[in-house]
Each structure stands twice: as C-alpha cells, then as structure tokens.
Swiss-Prot record:
Glycans are attached at N246. The active site is at H229. Optimum pH is 2.0. This is Endopolygalacturonase A. Optimum temperature is 50 degrees Celsius.
Amino acid sequence: MPSAKPLFCLATLAGAALAAPAPSRATDFNKRSTCTFTDAATASESKTSCSDIVLKDITVPAGETLNLKDLNDGTTVTFEGTTTWEYEEWDGPLLRISGKDITVTQSSDAVLNGNGAKWWDGEGTNGGKTKPKFFYAHDLDDSKISGLYIKNTPVQAISVESDNLVIEDVTIDNSDGDSEGGHNTDGFDISESTYITITGATVKNQGDCVAINSGENIYFSGGTCSGGHGLSIGSVGGRDDNTVKNVTFIDSTVSDSENGVRIKTVYDATGTVEDITYSNIQLSGISDYGIVIEQDYENGDPTGTPSNGVTISDVTLEDITGSVDSDAVEIYILCGDGSCTDWTMSGIDITGGETSSDCENVPSGASCSQ
C-alpha cells in the first residue's frame, strides 16, 4: 500500500487549498479507475469502487451469483479469460448485472462457461435436477451487452427485464446439449421490457432462440438460430403483464429446429399480441412447423382447443422461405373465434412438408396453404 499515503496526502492538500471541491474530485478519480477482480466475492463487494470492472478467470462458487447488481451509472464490465460456475442444484441466477448506462463486453478470447452438462438430464425446467438460470439482465437500462460468448447454460441463458437495452453480436452455444441432455436452454427470454434491440445473435440450443412473453418495441435482426424451438412470442397470458406489442423479427435464419416462426397464447387467459412482423426469415431442417400460431396452450402444452381471450392483431408475415421435414406442417393457424384480426401474409414459400387440414378461424389475409 505504499501509494495510498501519497494519494491521501494529495487529496488532503487539495482539500486545504480548495475546500469542499477536493473530496468530490477524489471520488471522481476513484470512479474513473479500473478494477481487476479474480474472485466473485470481491467483485460483488467492491463493484461500486470503480467505473471499469475487469473480471478475469473467475470461478464462481457453487450456489452463488456473480452479483453485479446496482452498478454505478456508466460502468463498463469486461470479462477476460474463462468465467466458470461450480455445480449445485438451485434456481440461480448464475450472473446478475443491473444499472444504468452500463456496457457489458469481453476480451476476444473470453468464455462464460455455465458448465451446463453437470445439470443436464433431458428434463430442463420440467423436472429432474433443479437448474439455475444463467444471466439476469434485469433493470439493465439504457445499456449495452456486446460480443459475449456464452457456453453450456444449465437452462435459459439470458433473461431480459429492462428498458432501452441493446444486445449485439452475442453467441450462446449450447450445442453440446444436443447429445448430452440439454433442454429448455432458451437463448433470450424477454418479459416486461421496452425498447430491446438484439442484433447479430448466434444461438445454438434446445429451447426457444427468442421467447417474448411480454414487452413492447422489441427488434431482433440478423440472428442465426439452430437446434431449438425457433423465433417465438409467448406463451402470452396468465402473467402479471400480458401485452406484447410492436415486435419485429427480420433478416434471420432458423435451422434444424422444431419450429421456424411461432406465436402461442394461453387457453382461457386474457392479453394482447399486437403489431407483430416476421420478415425475411429463412428456414431449413424444421421438424414440426414452419409457421405456427395457436391459442390453445394450457400447462405449457397445446390442447387443440383455442380460446379468444388473448387477441392477436396487426400481424405481418412476409418473405418467410425455406424447407421443413417431410412429416412437418408448413403452416398451422389455430385461432379463437374472432380473436385473430388484421393479418397479412406475402412472399411465403415453405416447402417439403404437409399442408394442415386442422386450421381454425384463420383471419382474412392469412392462409394455411400457399
């Protein structure tokens, strides 16, 4: 600590000369400094002592959160090396970051490794081991997450509950879960959020690439999704917030997945899905549905019986092209009586599968055939 005394003395002398402003400048100096942390406890305890936080080769103890909640405004968080989490059955999250005007990024070779294989048992959140969610980006407002490489999350990767958050060039690689029992490894789960922009994401998983449960003004562009359940809205209904409004999925690919484009709402619930656009979505290797919109979910599964309490309106499906498996359905629409309105479909060219004869209450402007 040889440098502490000179700094203290300088601050004291400045205080003698300039009175009250000196402590303010000392505080500003501390906030401008860079802190490098190599253990989770110190990072969590000292996170507000500086405005540039470097997390280097941290191993987070079992059952603990790498907690970067309530950071100072304007803080930058940089991951270096490999960040890992030790095994314990619990709900998580493994990582939590919140604050305003925060930048979260990493060095070029960094990895956030959730060690998901230790939890994977083919059950996901439906049973078996209790699995922690990975990253809560909650109350991370007016902020940016850029360039993260996330590998092997136990279940859902990034949970978003924020306002004005940009997520760019993030990779979520749960491809090991294809053969090791990964399930419900959603890429991005979005709820109670406004103005969320996700660009250039790569998601390899066994769950939704994106699932929007509630929120407004959400934009997903340039995504590459494989192995999972597709680009999803819902299930909508039965939550505190049951509105999804002004959502765009554009210029993205979905491959080797159960679904391409999906909107699902909860049976006998209420809510609103409004002003939705899927544009220029390319599909390949889809096993279940190219496009599926249904209003019959109950206890997490479709029932075949729709209800009309959640309305789905102002939907644009355009330039959705590609192929599905031979036993997959190209387009399936199951709406309640009068609850689906003002839809337009154009440039739909999905090949290789079956045409559904079970669609119900298909709104004007849409069709289950091409």
